Amino acid sequence: MIWVAVVITMLLFILVAKPTGIYLEKAFQGSKKLDKVFGPFEKLIFKITGVKEYNQTWKQYALSLVLLNGFMIVVVYFIFRLQGVLPLNPAHIEGMEPTLAFNTAISFMADTNLQHYSGENGLSYLSQLIGITFLMFAAPATTLALVMAFIRGLAGKELGNFFIDFTRALTRVFLPIAFMAALVFVALGVPQTLDGAVTAQTIDGAKQSILRGPVASFVAIKELGNNGGGFFGANSTHPFENPGQMSNILQMMLMMLLPTALPFTYGRMVGNKKQGRILFVSLFMVFLLGFITITTSELNGNPALNAMGIERVQGSTEGKEVRFGTVFSSLYATVTTAAETGAVNTMHDTLTPIGGLVPLVNMMLNTVYGGVGAGFVNIIMYAIIAVFISGLMVGRTPEFLGKKIEGKEMKLIAVTILFHPLLILGFSALALSTSLGTDAISHSGFHGLTQVVYEYTSSAANNGSGFEGLGDNTPFWNITTGLVMFLGRYFSLITMLAVAASLKEKTVVPETVGTFRTDNGLFGGIFIGTIVIVGALTFFPMLVLGPIAEFLTLK
Protein backbone atom coordinates (compact mmCIF):
# COMPACT_ATOMS: atom_id res chain seq x y z
CA MET A 1 0.00 0.00 0.00
CA ILE A 2 2.83 2.38 0.84
CA TRP A 3 4.34 1.98 -2.62
CA VAL A 4 0.98 2.72 -4.25
CA ALA A 5 0.88 5.97 -2.28
CA VAL A 6 4.43 6.79 -3.42
CA VAL A 7 3.54 6.16 -7.08
CA ILE A 8 0.41 8.33 -6.78
CA THR A 9 2.49 11.11 -5.20
CA MET A 10 5.03 10.90 -8.04
CA LEU A 11 2.22 11.00 -10.62
CA LEU A 12 0.82 14.10 -8.95
CA PHE A 13 4.24 15.76 -9.30
CA ILE A 14 4.15 15.01 -13.03
CA LEU A 15 0.49 15.87 -13.67
CA VAL A 16 0.57 19.35 -12.14
CA ALA A 17 3.91 20.38 -13.69
CA LYS A 18 2.76 21.20 -17.22
CA PRO A 19 -0.46 23.12 -16.33
CA THR A 20 1.50 25.16 -13.78
CA GLY A 21 4.19 25.85 -16.38
CA ILE A 22 1.58 27.11 -18.83
CA TYR A 23 0.08 29.35 -16.14
CA LEU A 24 3.48 30.85 -15.30
CA GLU A 25 4.09 31.68 -18.96
CA LYS A 26 0.73 33.45 -19.18
CA ALA A 27 1.22 35.23 -15.84
CA PHE A 28 4.46 36.89 -16.96
CA GLN A 29 3.80 37.29 -20.67
CA GLY A 30 0.70 39.45 -20.39
CA SER A 31 -2.38 37.22 -20.60
CA LYS A 32 -5.44 39.43 -21.14
CA LYS A 33 -7.55 37.39 -18.72
CA LEU A 34 -4.97 37.62 -15.96
CA ASP A 35 -4.38 41.31 -16.67
CA LYS A 36 -8.08 41.96 -16.10
CA VAL A 37 -7.97 40.21 -12.73
CA PHE A 38 -4.62 41.40 -11.37
CA GLY A 39 -3.87 44.44 -13.53
CA PRO A 40 -5.78 47.11 -11.54
CA PHE A 41 -4.20 46.07 -8.23
CA GLU A 42 -0.72 45.91 -9.78
CA LYS A 43 -1.09 49.35 -11.37
CA LEU A 44 -2.09 50.75 -7.98
CA ILE A 45 1.10 49.26 -6.49
CA PHE A 46 3.19 50.75 -9.31
CA LYS A 47 1.57 54.14 -8.78
CA ILE A 48 2.17 54.13 -5.03
CA THR A 49 5.78 52.93 -5.33
CA GLY A 50 6.61 55.07 -8.36
CA VAL A 51 7.58 52.15 -10.60
CA LYS A 52 7.82 53.08 -14.26
CA GLU A 53 7.06 50.45 -16.88
CA TYR A 54 10.17 50.25 -19.09
CA ASN A 55 12.62 47.56 -20.18
CA GLN A 56 15.85 47.40 -18.21
CA THR A 57 19.32 46.36 -19.31
CA TRP A 58 20.79 43.31 -17.56
CA LYS A 59 22.89 45.57 -15.34
CA GLN A 60 19.86 47.67 -14.34
CA TYR A 61 17.85 44.50 -13.69
CA ALA A 62 20.59 42.97 -11.53
CA LEU A 63 21.20 46.22 -9.64
CA SER A 64 17.47 46.64 -8.91
CA LEU A 65 17.35 43.09 -7.58
CA VAL A 66 20.40 43.43 -5.32
CA LEU A 67 19.41 46.86 -3.96
CA LEU A 68 15.84 45.82 -3.12
CA ASN A 69 17.02 42.60 -1.48
CA GLY A 70 19.75 44.45 0.42
CA PHE A 71 17.22 46.98 1.74
CA MET A 72 14.96 44.15 2.93
CA ILE A 73 17.86 42.45 4.72
CA VAL A 74 18.65 45.64 6.65
CA VAL A 75 15.01 46.25 7.66
CA VAL A 76 14.45 42.68 8.83
CA TYR A 77 17.80 42.64 10.67
CA PHE A 78 16.64 45.53 12.86
CA ILE A 79 13.25 43.87 13.45
CA PHE A 80 15.07 40.82 14.81
CA ARG A 81 17.38 42.93 16.96
CA LEU A 82 14.53 45.02 18.42
CA GLN A 83 11.81 42.36 18.73
CA GLY A 84 12.06 42.49 22.53
CA VAL A 85 10.58 46.01 22.60
CA LEU A 86 8.21 45.62 19.64
CA PRO A 87 4.54 44.49 19.83
CA LEU A 88 3.13 41.00 19.12
CA ASN A 89 5.51 39.36 21.56
CA PRO A 90 3.31 37.47 24.06
CA ALA A 91 6.20 35.19 25.10
CA HIS A 92 8.43 38.24 25.85
CA ILE A 93 11.27 36.96 23.66
CA GLU A 94 14.38 39.14 23.72
CA GLY A 95 16.08 40.65 20.69
CA MET A 96 18.41 38.45 18.66
CA GLU A 97 22.16 38.43 19.18
CA PRO A 98 23.84 40.49 16.37
CA THR A 99 25.56 37.67 14.45
CA LEU A 100 22.46 35.47 14.69
CA ALA A 101 20.26 38.32 13.38
CA PHE A 102 22.77 38.85 10.54
CA ASN A 103 22.66 35.15 9.65
CA THR A 104 18.87 34.87 9.88
CA ALA A 105 18.12 37.98 7.81
CA ILE A 106 20.43 36.85 5.00
CA SER A 107 19.20 33.27 5.32
CA PHE A 108 15.57 34.12 4.62
CA MET A 109 16.32 36.76 1.97
CA ALA A 110 18.53 34.25 0.17
CA ASP A 111 15.66 31.71 0.21
CA THR A 112 17.89 29.42 2.30
CA ASN A 113 16.13 29.46 5.68
CA LEU A 114 19.12 28.07 7.52
CA GLN A 115 18.05 28.34 11.15
CA HIS A 116 20.59 28.61 13.95
CA TYR A 117 17.73 29.30 16.37
CA SER A 118 14.57 27.47 17.41
CA GLY A 119 11.49 29.16 15.95
CA GLU A 120 9.14 28.83 18.91
CA ASN A 121 11.46 30.51 21.41
CA GLY A 122 13.74 32.54 19.15
CA LEU A 123 11.27 34.83 17.40
CA SER A 124 8.23 36.90 18.38
CA TYR A 125 5.02 36.77 16.33
CA LEU A 126 5.96 40.13 14.80
CA SER A 127 9.32 38.74 13.68
CA GLN A 128 7.64 35.61 12.33
CA LEU A 129 5.03 37.59 10.38
CA ILE A 130 6.77 40.79 9.23
CA GLY A 131 10.29 39.45 9.21
CA ILE A 132 10.25 35.78 8.29
CA THR A 133 6.96 35.34 6.39
CA PHE A 134 7.51 38.59 4.47
CA LEU A 135 10.92 37.39 3.27
CA MET A 136 9.46 33.98 2.47
CA PHE A 137 7.34 35.72 -0.18
CA ALA A 138 9.97 38.22 -1.31
CA ALA A 139 12.85 35.75 -1.73
CA PRO A 140 11.22 33.31 -4.19
CA ALA A 141 9.49 36.20 -5.98
CA THR A 142 12.95 37.65 -6.61
CA THR A 143 14.30 34.55 -8.33
CA LEU A 144 11.06 33.79 -10.18
CA ALA A 145 11.23 37.32 -11.60
CA LEU A 146 14.88 36.86 -12.55
CA VAL A 147 14.34 33.51 -14.27
CA MET A 148 11.65 35.09 -16.44
CA ALA A 149 14.12 37.79 -17.50
CA PHE A 150 16.72 35.06 -18.06
CA ILE A 151 14.41 33.06 -20.34
CA ARG A 152 13.38 36.19 -22.26
CA GLY A 153 17.05 36.89 -22.90
CA LEU A 154 17.61 33.35 -24.19
CA ALA A 155 14.60 33.82 -26.49
CA GLY A 156 16.11 37.03 -27.90
CA LYS A 157 13.57 39.33 -26.26
CA GLU A 158 13.90 42.31 -23.93
CA LEU A 159 14.61 41.29 -20.34
CA GLY A 160 11.73 43.29 -18.90
CA ASN A 161 11.56 45.23 -15.65
CA PHE A 162 12.53 43.67 -12.32
CA PHE A 163 9.98 45.56 -10.22
CA ILE A 164 7.13 44.59 -12.57
CA ASP A 165 8.19 40.94 -12.65
CA PHE A 166 8.68 40.92 -8.87
CA THR A 167 5.18 42.31 -8.31
CA ARG A 168 3.60 39.83 -10.72
CA ALA A 169 5.38 36.95 -9.01
CA LEU A 170 3.76 38.00 -5.74
CA THR A 171 0.27 38.90 -6.95
CA ARG A 172 -0.20 36.21 -9.61
CA VAL A 173 1.69 33.25 -8.18
CA PHE A 174 2.70 33.21 -4.53
CA LEU A 175 -0.12 35.08 -2.77
CA PRO A 176 -3.09 33.26 -4.39
CA ILE A 177 -1.56 29.76 -4.27
CA ALA A 178 -0.24 30.19 -0.72
CA PHE A 179 -3.63 31.50 0.44
CA MET A 180 -5.44 28.44 -0.92
CA ALA A 181 -2.79 26.08 0.46
CA ALA A 182 -3.03 27.68 3.92
CA LEU A 183 -6.78 27.02 4.02
CA VAL A 184 -6.16 23.36 3.20
CA PHE A 185 -3.53 23.12 5.92
CA VAL A 186 -5.98 24.58 8.45
CA ALA A 187 -8.52 21.94 7.38
CA LEU A 188 -5.86 19.27 7.94
CA GLY A 189 -5.28 20.43 11.52
CA VAL A 190 -2.46 22.98 11.28
CA PRO A 191 -3.12 25.87 13.74
CA GLN A 192 -3.58 29.48 12.61
CA THR A 193 -3.85 31.95 15.49
CA LEU A 194 -2.17 34.98 17.04
CA ASP A 195 -2.98 33.80 20.56
CA GLY A 196 -0.15 32.84 22.87
CA ALA A 197 0.72 29.43 24.27
CA VAL A 198 -1.91 27.17 25.83
CA THR A 199 -1.30 25.67 29.26
CA ALA A 200 -2.44 22.06 29.41
CA GLN A 201 -2.51 19.55 32.24
CA THR A 202 -0.87 16.21 31.49
CA ILE A 203 -2.07 12.79 32.66
CA ASP A 204 0.28 12.82 35.65
CA GLY A 205 -1.00 16.24 36.72
CA ALA A 206 1.93 18.34 35.56
CA LYS A 207 1.37 21.51 33.55
CA GLN A 208 2.72 21.86 30.02
CA SER A 209 2.95 24.94 27.82
CA ILE A 210 1.88 24.18 24.23
CA LEU A 211 3.12 26.76 21.76
CA ARG A 212 1.10 27.72 18.68
CA GLY A 213 0.78 30.64 16.26
CA PRO A 214 0.03 31.54 12.62
CA VAL A 215 1.48 28.21 11.48
CA ALA A 216 -0.74 27.32 8.48
CA SER A 217 0.04 30.50 6.53
CA PHE A 218 3.71 30.06 7.41
CA VAL A 219 3.88 26.45 6.19
CA ALA A 220 2.09 27.24 2.92
CA ILE A 221 4.68 29.76 1.69
CA LYS A 222 7.50 27.85 3.37
CA GLU A 223 6.93 24.96 0.95
CA LEU A 224 5.59 26.81 -2.11
CA GLY A 225 8.49 29.26 -2.16
CA ASN A 226 11.10 26.54 -1.52
CA ASN A 227 11.96 28.34 1.71
CA GLY A 228 12.01 25.47 4.18
CA GLY A 229 12.40 27.25 7.52
CA GLY A 230 10.27 25.92 10.35
CA PHE A 231 7.86 27.85 12.56
CA PHE A 232 8.96 25.37 15.22
CA GLY A 233 12.50 24.18 15.79
CA ALA A 234 11.55 20.62 14.80
CA ASN A 235 10.35 21.89 11.40
CA SER A 236 7.99 19.52 9.57
CA THR A 237 8.53 16.73 12.09
CA HIS A 238 6.40 18.83 14.48
CA PRO A 239 2.73 17.69 14.47
CA PHE A 240 1.52 21.31 14.33
CA GLU A 241 3.42 21.88 11.08
CA ASN A 242 2.82 18.46 9.56
CA PRO A 243 0.00 16.55 11.30
CA GLY A 244 -0.24 13.49 9.04
CA GLN A 245 0.31 11.83 5.69
CA MET A 246 -2.06 14.12 3.77
CA SER A 247 -0.28 17.27 4.93
CA ASN A 248 3.02 15.51 4.22
CA ILE A 249 2.07 14.82 0.59
CA LEU A 250 0.68 18.34 0.15
CA GLN A 251 3.96 19.81 1.41
CA MET A 252 5.95 17.74 -1.08
CA MET A 253 3.63 18.79 -3.91
CA LEU A 254 4.06 22.46 -3.04
CA MET A 255 7.84 22.04 -2.94
CA MET A 256 7.92 20.48 -6.40
CA LEU A 257 5.20 22.63 -7.99
CA LEU A 258 7.22 25.54 -9.39
CA PRO A 259 10.63 23.89 -9.99
CA THR A 260 9.04 21.13 -12.09
CA ALA A 261 6.83 23.64 -13.94
CA LEU A 262 9.65 25.91 -15.12
CA PRO A 263 10.99 23.57 -17.87
CA PHE A 264 7.53 23.73 -19.49
CA THR A 265 7.40 27.51 -19.06
CA TYR A 266 10.82 27.74 -20.67
CA GLY A 267 9.80 25.54 -23.61
CA ARG A 268 6.81 27.74 -24.39
CA MET A 269 8.69 31.03 -24.00
CA VAL A 270 11.61 30.04 -26.28
CA GLY A 271 9.37 28.34 -28.83
CA ASN A 272 10.75 24.83 -28.29
CA LYS A 273 8.32 22.83 -26.15
CA LYS A 274 10.13 19.55 -26.83
CA GLN A 275 13.32 20.88 -25.24
CA GLY A 276 11.38 21.77 -22.11
CA ARG A 277 9.98 18.24 -21.96
CA ILE A 278 13.43 16.69 -22.43
CA LEU A 279 14.82 18.76 -19.55
CA PHE A 280 11.89 17.76 -17.32
CA VAL A 281 12.18 14.03 -18.10
CA SER A 282 15.98 13.99 -17.75
CA LEU A 283 15.87 15.65 -14.35
CA PHE A 284 13.04 13.39 -13.18
CA MET A 285 15.21 10.36 -13.97
CA VAL A 286 18.01 11.76 -11.80
CA PHE A 287 15.46 12.55 -9.07
CA LEU A 288 14.07 9.00 -9.24
CA LEU A 289 17.56 7.52 -8.99
CA GLY A 290 18.21 9.57 -5.86
CA PHE A 291 14.94 8.44 -4.27
CA ILE A 292 15.62 4.76 -5.01
CA THR A 293 19.13 5.05 -3.56
CA ILE A 294 18.14 6.72 -0.28
CA THR A 295 15.09 4.48 0.21
CA THR A 296 17.08 1.29 -0.39
CA SER A 297 19.75 2.41 2.06
CA GLU A 298 17.26 3.40 4.77
CA LEU A 299 15.19 0.22 4.40
CA ASN A 300 18.34 -1.90 4.70
CA GLY A 301 18.96 -0.29 8.08
CA ASN A 302 22.16 0.50 9.93
CA PRO A 303 24.83 -2.14 9.12
CA ALA A 304 26.26 -1.94 12.65
CA LEU A 305 22.87 -2.69 14.22
CA ASN A 306 22.08 -5.37 11.64
CA ALA A 307 25.28 -7.20 12.61
CA MET A 308 23.94 -7.38 16.17
CA GLY A 309 20.81 -9.18 14.97
CA ILE A 310 18.43 -6.32 15.80
CA GLU A 311 15.06 -6.38 14.01
CA ARG A 312 15.00 -4.13 10.92
CA VAL A 313 11.61 -4.69 9.26
CA GLN A 314 11.01 -0.92 9.18
CA GLY A 315 14.60 -0.18 8.18
CA SER A 316 16.56 2.54 9.94
CA THR A 317 13.97 4.31 12.08
CA GLU A 318 16.35 6.56 14.02
CA GLY A 319 15.32 10.21 13.70
CA LYS A 320 12.11 9.39 11.80
CA GLU A 321 8.48 10.06 12.67
CA VAL A 322 6.34 6.91 12.95
CA ARG A 323 3.40 8.62 11.23
CA PHE A 324 5.45 9.06 8.04
CA GLY A 325 7.52 5.88 8.04
CA THR A 326 10.85 5.15 6.38
CA VAL A 327 9.71 5.32 2.74
CA PHE A 328 7.89 8.67 2.92
CA SER A 329 10.65 10.12 5.09
CA SER A 330 13.11 9.13 2.35
CA LEU A 331 10.89 10.65 -0.34
CA TYR A 332 10.56 13.88 1.65
CA ALA A 333 14.35 14.08 2.13
CA THR A 334 14.83 13.62 -1.63
CA VAL A 335 12.20 16.23 -2.51
CA THR A 336 13.36 18.85 -0.03
CA THR A 337 16.97 18.74 -1.27
CA ALA A 338 16.12 18.29 -4.95
CA ALA A 339 13.82 21.33 -4.86
CA GLU A 340 16.29 23.16 -2.57
CA THR A 341 13.66 23.77 0.10
CA GLY A 342 15.34 22.53 3.25
CA ALA A 343 12.23 21.57 5.21
CA VAL A 344 12.66 18.25 7.01
CA ASN A 345 10.28 15.60 8.33
CA THR A 346 13.18 13.45 9.52
CA MET A 347 16.51 14.36 11.05
CA HIS A 348 19.09 14.16 8.24
CA ASP A 349 21.93 13.76 10.74
CA THR A 350 20.49 10.31 11.60
CA LEU A 351 20.27 9.05 8.00
CA THR A 352 22.45 6.10 7.07
CA PRO A 353 25.72 7.11 5.36
CA ILE A 354 24.44 6.42 1.82
CA GLY A 355 21.04 7.83 2.77
CA GLY A 356 22.72 11.07 3.86
CA LEU A 357 24.81 11.12 0.70
CA VAL A 358 21.73 11.59 -1.54
CA PRO A 359 20.56 14.91 -0.01
CA LEU A 360 24.18 16.07 0.00
CA VAL A 361 24.64 15.28 -3.71
CA ASN A 362 21.29 16.91 -4.57
CA MET A 363 22.52 20.16 -3.02
CA MET A 364 25.97 19.90 -4.56
CA LEU A 365 24.41 19.54 -8.02
CA ASN A 366 21.86 22.27 -7.19
CA THR A 367 20.00 21.47 -10.38
CA VAL A 368 17.59 18.55 -9.77
CA TYR A 369 15.26 20.51 -10.01
CA GLY A 370 16.73 23.25 -7.90
CA GLY A 371 14.82 25.98 -6.08
CA VAL A 372 12.32 28.42 -7.59
CA GLY A 373 14.07 30.23 -10.43
CA ALA A 374 17.65 29.86 -9.24
CA GLY A 375 17.61 26.12 -9.82
CA PHE A 376 16.39 26.51 -13.39
CA VAL A 377 19.18 28.99 -14.15
CA ASN A 378 21.61 26.24 -13.11
CA ILE A 379 19.76 23.74 -15.31
CA ILE A 380 20.30 25.91 -18.38
CA MET A 381 23.93 26.41 -17.36
CA TYR A 382 24.47 22.64 -17.49
CA ALA A 383 22.50 22.42 -20.76
CA ILE A 384 24.82 25.00 -22.37
CA ILE A 385 27.87 23.11 -21.07
CA ALA A 386 26.45 19.90 -22.58
CA VAL A 387 26.03 21.64 -25.95
CA PHE A 388 29.52 23.13 -25.72
CA ILE A 389 31.16 19.76 -24.97
CA SER A 390 29.20 18.10 -27.78
CA GLY A 391 30.27 20.82 -30.20
CA LEU A 392 33.92 20.38 -29.27
CA MET A 393 33.74 16.62 -29.83
CA VAL A 394 32.54 17.02 -33.44
CA GLY A 395 34.63 20.09 -34.22
CA ARG A 396 31.68 22.44 -34.63
CA THR A 397 30.89 25.80 -33.04
CA PRO A 398 28.29 24.96 -30.36
CA GLU A 399 24.83 26.51 -30.69
CA PHE A 400 22.05 26.84 -28.16
CA LEU A 401 18.58 27.91 -29.31
CA GLY A 402 20.18 28.90 -32.61
CA LYS A 403 22.71 31.22 -30.94
CA LYS A 404 26.45 30.55 -31.09
CA ILE A 405 28.06 29.81 -27.72
CA GLU A 406 31.38 31.63 -27.73
CA GLY A 407 34.20 32.62 -25.38
CA LYS A 408 32.33 35.32 -23.44
CA GLU A 409 29.47 33.03 -22.46
CA MET A 410 31.72 30.10 -21.57
CA LYS A 411 34.00 32.25 -19.41
CA LEU A 412 31.02 33.46 -17.40
CA ILE A 413 29.68 29.91 -17.09
CA ALA A 414 33.11 28.55 -16.11
CA VAL A 415 33.45 31.12 -13.33
CA THR A 416 29.90 30.37 -12.16
CA ILE A 417 30.33 26.61 -12.07
CA LEU A 418 33.64 26.88 -10.19
CA PHE A 419 32.32 29.36 -7.63
CA HIS A 420 29.85 26.89 -6.06
CA PRO A 421 32.42 24.21 -5.07
CA LEU A 422 34.95 26.87 -4.06
CA LEU A 423 32.46 28.30 -1.56
CA ILE A 424 31.64 24.89 -0.12
CA LEU A 425 35.11 23.37 0.02
CA GLY A 426 36.92 26.60 0.88
CA PHE A 427 34.77 27.45 3.89
CA SER A 428 34.68 23.79 4.97
CA ALA A 429 38.49 23.78 4.99
CA LEU A 430 38.45 27.00 7.03
CA ALA A 431 36.06 25.52 9.60
CA LEU A 432 38.11 22.34 9.92
CA SER A 433 41.36 24.26 10.36
CA THR A 434 40.27 26.22 13.43
CA SER A 435 38.80 25.33 16.81
CA LEU A 436 36.08 27.92 16.14
CA GLY A 437 34.71 25.46 13.60
CA THR A 438 35.67 22.07 15.00
CA ASP A 439 34.27 22.79 18.48
CA ALA A 440 30.77 22.65 16.96
CA ILE A 441 31.19 19.09 15.63
CA SER A 442 29.31 16.50 17.71
CA HIS A 443 30.73 13.40 15.98
CA SER A 444 34.37 12.62 15.38
CA GLY A 445 35.71 11.03 12.22
CA PHE A 446 33.98 10.77 8.86
CA HIS A 447 30.53 11.79 10.08
CA GLY A 448 31.93 14.95 11.64
CA LEU A 449 33.44 15.93 8.29
CA THR A 450 30.07 15.35 6.64
CA GLN A 451 28.38 17.58 9.22
CA VAL A 452 30.66 20.49 8.32
CA VAL A 453 30.46 20.05 4.55
CA TYR A 454 26.68 19.56 4.70
CA GLU A 455 26.27 22.89 6.53
CA TYR A 456 28.20 24.85 3.90
CA THR A 457 26.68 22.90 1.00
CA SER A 458 23.21 23.67 2.32
CA SER A 459 24.18 27.34 2.65
CA ALA A 460 25.74 27.65 -0.81
CA ALA A 461 22.85 25.81 -2.48
CA ASN A 462 20.30 27.99 -0.62
CA ASN A 463 18.71 24.86 0.83
CA GLY A 464 18.83 25.40 4.58
CA SER A 465 18.52 21.84 5.89
CA GLY A 466 21.26 20.67 8.20
CA PHE A 467 22.91 17.81 10.02
CA GLU A 468 21.55 19.21 13.26
CA GLY A 469 24.16 17.53 15.41
CA LEU A 470 26.33 20.53 14.55
CA GLY A 471 26.40 23.21 17.27
CA ASP A 472 26.21 26.05 14.76
CA ASN A 473 24.78 28.99 16.74
CA THR A 474 28.16 30.64 17.33
CA PRO A 475 29.58 33.88 15.86
CA PHE A 476 31.94 31.87 13.61
CA TRP A 477 29.22 29.73 12.05
CA ASN A 478 26.67 32.58 11.91
CA ILE A 479 29.06 34.87 10.01
CA THR A 480 30.64 32.30 7.68
CA THR A 481 27.38 30.63 6.66
CA GLY A 482 25.81 34.08 6.25
CA LEU A 483 28.55 35.05 3.79
CA VAL A 484 28.24 31.73 1.93
CA MET A 485 24.46 32.14 1.63
CA PHE A 486 24.75 35.68 0.29
CA LEU A 487 27.51 34.91 -2.22
CA GLY A 488 25.97 31.59 -3.25
CA ARG A 489 22.68 33.32 -3.93
CA TYR A 490 23.57 36.40 -5.91
CA PHE A 491 26.81 35.60 -7.74
CA SER A 492 25.38 32.93 -10.03
CA LEU A 493 22.14 34.86 -10.63
CA ILE A 494 24.04 37.90 -11.87
CA THR A 495 26.58 36.03 -14.01
CA MET A 496 23.93 33.88 -15.69
CA LEU A 497 21.75 36.94 -16.34
CA ALA A 498 24.79 38.39 -18.12
CA VAL A 499 24.98 35.20 -20.21
CA ALA A 500 21.32 35.57 -21.22
CA ALA A 501 21.87 39.23 -22.09
CA SER A 502 24.85 38.29 -24.26
CA LEU A 503 22.84 35.63 -26.13
CA LYS A 504 19.97 38.09 -26.59
CA GLU A 505 22.13 40.27 -28.82
CA LYS A 506 23.15 37.43 -31.13
CA THR A 507 21.44 36.61 -34.40
CA VAL A 508 19.85 33.20 -34.83
CA VAL A 509 21.89 30.83 -36.98
CA PRO A 510 19.74 28.86 -39.48
CA GLU A 511 19.36 25.21 -38.53
CA THR A 512 21.19 22.74 -40.79
CA VAL A 513 21.67 18.96 -40.98
CA GLY A 514 24.78 19.30 -38.80
CA THR A 515 23.05 21.27 -36.04
CA PHE A 516 23.11 19.46 -32.70
CA ARG A 517 19.49 19.17 -31.62
CA THR A 518 18.62 19.86 -28.00
CA ASP A 519 15.10 18.42 -28.04
CA ASN A 520 15.73 14.68 -28.31
CA GLY A 521 16.80 11.74 -26.15
CA LEU A 522 20.45 11.99 -27.18
CA PHE A 523 20.69 15.49 -25.75
CA GLY A 524 18.89 14.31 -22.61
CA GLY A 525 21.52 11.61 -22.09
CA ILE A 526 24.41 14.02 -22.66
CA PHE A 527 22.73 16.53 -20.34
CA ILE A 528 22.53 13.95 -17.53
CA GLY A 529 26.11 12.88 -18.20
CA THR A 530 27.28 16.49 -17.98
CA ILE A 531 25.57 16.96 -14.62
CA VAL A 532 27.20 13.80 -13.26
CA ILE A 533 30.68 14.40 -14.71
CA VAL A 534 31.01 18.14 -14.14
CA GLY A 535 28.86 18.41 -11.03
CA ALA A 536 29.22 15.23 -9.02
CA LEU A 537 32.88 14.49 -9.75
CA THR A 538 33.84 17.96 -8.49
CA PHE A 539 32.89 16.82 -5.00
CA PHE A 540 33.81 13.14 -5.31
CA PRO A 541 36.97 13.30 -3.12
CA MET A 542 34.98 14.89 -0.30
CA LEU A 543 32.19 12.31 -0.65
CA VAL A 544 34.77 9.53 -0.40
CA LEU A 545 36.21 11.03 2.79
CA GLY A 546 32.75 11.61 4.28
CA PRO A 547 29.65 9.44 3.78
CA ILE A 548 31.30 6.73 1.64
CA ALA A 549 34.13 6.19 4.14
CA GLU A 550 31.60 6.13 6.98
CA PHE A 551 29.57 3.50 5.13
CA LEU A 552 32.62 1.32 4.55
CA THR A 553 33.65 1.49 8.21
CA LEU A 554 30.15 0.48 9.32
CA LYS A 555 30.27 -2.47 6.95
From Swiss-Prot:
Gene name, Swiss-Prot/TrEMBL: kdpA
GO molecular function, one term: potassium ion binding
Record's protein name: Potassium-transporting ATPase potassium-binding subunit
GO CC annotation terms, alphabetical: plasma membrane
Described function: Part of the high-affinity ATP-driven potassium transport (or Kdp) system, which catalyzes the hydrolysis of ATP coupled with the electrogenic transport of potassium into the cytoplasm. This subunit binds the extracellular potassium ions and delivers the ions to the membrane domain of KdpB through an intramembrane tunnel.
Family: Belongs to the KdpA family.
Keywords (A to Z) from UniProt: Cell membrane, Ion transport, Membrane, Potassium, Potassium transport, Transmembrane, Transmembrane helix, Transport
Subunit field text: The system is composed of three essential subunits: KdpA, KdpB and KdpC.
Matches recorded under Pfam families: KdpA
Transmembrane segments: 2-22, 60-80, 130-150, 173-193, 246-266, 278-298, 374-394, 412-432, 483-503, 525-545
Statement: the UniProt record of this protein carries the keyword Cell membrane: yes
Record has Translocase as a keyword: no
HAMAP family noted in UniProt: KdpA
Cellular localization per UniProt: Cell membrane
Membrane topology of the entry: Multi-pass membrane protein
